[in-house]
């Protein structure tokens, strides 16, 4: 199955879509995105990162967000500023620990895939992202906690051939969500 494509341009070439066309396209994408997607944030402390992740989660149709550890709360002004109101589109639950959050995700029928540069991790493009998944991301400086890595079903990393060792957590979340959705659309 391939994702819906935007309507074609005219003789003048491509053009930006009108709002009604964007809404129609979004409805089609939701229809073909059968797999459930959720996120678990383990001590993501910077409010602007949390807000960016929430906005991306809403854009990719994530249905749930588990916040744990020292993750900035959705009520923080910095989160609200970056999320631009999208926090109302994603259900959120605060859990005491990443292990409790991972167990809640598993109980909801989600495979927990931690996104981390760790020994034994598989490249994201080889990770089992088919079906219902919860992508777990960790702290900006320390990544996912050892406790979270121990309970995750899979640990995956984003291959980065450049000279930088890691991505910003909000960027990594968006890359992982895009790959999960791409996988759902191409099976």
Where are these regions (language model features)?
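Post-transcriptional modification and biogenesis factors for structured RNAs
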Residues: 1-187
